[in-house]
Amino acid sequence: LRIVDRIKDMIIKGGENIYPKEIEAVAAGADGVLEVAVVGRADPRLGEVPVLFVTARPGALVDVEAVRSLLAAELSRFKLPAEIVVLEHLPKNPVGKIDKPALRRALAVPATSP
């Protein structure tokens, strides 16, 4: 199996190269999952860690633990996402592709409490 991905999307976690497409390919097969995207989030110890964003198919719910178990069964431990985020929809650019830069920007903004 050979995964082809954009070099700028590659995540370097503790010296290991992680290609988001590899994680996305596995996560897309999880029950109830419609769309997936993986981006890197800065980590003070490891450099970057992968974060998986998923959306649910209409009428379905995404079981985050089931997605995590599927990923753990299929991927090396260092490739597992540090976090799985379920969104109503993924941001898209004007041509309809998933806007990964928007997801990276969202991760860079500190969460606020209500």
Q: How should each PLM-predicted stretch be described?
A:
Residues 1-79, 88-91, 96, 102-105:
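AMP-binding/adenylate-forming catalytic core of the ANL superfamily
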